[in-house]
Amino acid sequence: MRVNPDELTKVIEERIKSYESGEIKEIGWVMQVSDGIVRAYGLKDVMTNELVEIETSEGEKIYGIAMNLEEDNVGIITLGDYKGIKEGDKLVRTNRIIEVPVGEKLLGRVVNPLGMPLDGKGEINTDDFYPIERKAMGVVTRKPVDTPLQTGLKVLDALIPIGRGQRELIIGDRQTGKTAIATDTIINQKGKNVFCIYVSIGQKSSGLARTIDNLEKYGAMDYTVVVAADASDPASLQYIAPYAGAAIGEYFMFNGKDALVIYDDLTKHAAAYREISLLLRRPPGREAYPGDIFYLHSRLLERASRLNENYGNGSLTALPIIETQANDISAYIPTNVISITDGQIYLETGLFNAGIRPAVNIGLSVSRVGGDAQTKAMKRVAGSLKLDLAQYRELESFTQFAADLDEATKKQLTKGEKLTELMKQPQYSPMEMEEQVAVIYAANEGYLDQIPTDRISDFERQFLAYLKENYRDTLNKIRESKDIADEIKKELNEAISKFLNVFR
């Protein structure tokens, strides 16, 4: 029997074609599991921070992140309940870094750091996914901060202005109003085309529920995404939460829009990372934090930026929050974040308890780049305000020891008291820029000298109502021109004089 080589070749080719090429997967096995950390062997080519799929003996799939790449094993943090994982379970590489869903379909939703909904409003159907870790945009892609981000709070917009693309730290002890400033800022973005991302890290569920309830009450959830990793969530989820929030914010920035992301708070984020690092047996450093704790926050906050025209003109503003112990801003994490950010808003327990709210310490608070973004109108009226208030606080502490004071000091103290009273503002009542300018202008021109200190808040409320009713055009001119020309000053002087005749 003669074999035809051509026929044989044809049969072999057909057989080869009939085989389905299987997907090549790199697998490993669990050696040890404890406290949410899995030690595995195999996975020789796994990347750092790569997403790994763990298949339990019950058929359940649990995801983890490869954090420690050692010679003979890989240290993996699990993103969920690790109790079903046993020694010998199989692991599979995914060949990708962890990603989160992004886009406008997330607005109004509460999600966990993996982008899974927590609000019971159904699935989020979006086609866009961003990696949670991304290299910050380079210097050539950026432009200087030049547009204000109005918080609606007089004391901040006048004295510690924030620009779009800035990183401004909110720092203070517990219960000093840090989250209140953040939520007021979100509420004030209504109608200003700024998309907000509120990242809750290690907070109590009751506190988070209250914040979400307030955002819904004031219509702020329409343009806000809440990323929540509360105190009961594993440290791994608390660790990735701010990066997920930054990725959601970057989507808006890369699409030429303005976004604001609030990290509440990075003290708990650092504690979660310390917990993970110690469980992975990484060497501890100062205050038991690992050596790369600075890089943890710098790579996160550097992602906030103001892009130039060639890259879409978008911006991502970051307001990280840090909780101090006994007003100690010289501790490790506070000093790290202060050195990374473009300024800080320092809230003081003493001021808060004295009823001065927002409890901003003017002397220790600063905005390094926000002044360039401040409107001309606000710059003109708020010029000497910060100095006056800082000097008043200094004088006030000295006068506790002095019995008799000269007239000039008494006058300065009275002025300082009235300005401090004017800077007070109730929560959930943000003010428009033109209203702030009008009120501060009245103080600068000495019109408050004849008003008793305890009537300042009444004066402000009634004066703004009077302006809206009788001088709406003047307010519109300030808003549109963003300046306070001589003509506007003349109209404001006329308005204040007329109002003082009817003020009671």
Swiss-Prot record:
It is found in: Cell inner membrane. Disulfide bonds: none annotated. ATP binds at residues 172-179. It catalyses: ATP + H2O + 4 H(+)(in) = ADP + phosphate + 5 H(+)(out). The record marks 365 as: Required for activity. GO terms for molecular function: ADP binding; ATP binding; proton-transporting ATP synthase activity, rotational mechanism. Its EC number is 7.1.2.2. It is a peripheral membrane protein. PROSITE patterns: ATPASE_ALPHA_BETA. One of its GO terms (cellular component) is proton-transporting ATP synthase complex. CDD domains: ATP-synt_F1_alpha_C, ATP-synt_F1_alpha_N, F1-ATPase_alpha_CD. F-type ATPases have 2 components, CF(1) - the catalytic core - and CF(0) - the membrane proton channel. CF(1) has five subunits: alpha(3), beta(3), gamma(1), delta(1), epsilon(1). CF(0) has three main subunits: a(1), b(2) and c(9-12). The alpha and beta chains form an alternating ring which encloses part of the gamma chain. CF(1) is attached to CF(0) by a central stalk formed by the gamma and epsilon chains, while a peripheral stalk is formed by the delta and b chains. Produces ATP from ADP in the presence of a proton gradient across the membrane. The alpha chain is a regulatory subunit. HAMAP family: ATP_synth_alpha_bact (MF_01346). This is ATP synthase subunit alpha. The lineage of its organism: Bacteria, Thermotogati, Thermotogota, Thermotogae, Petrotogales. The gene is atpA.
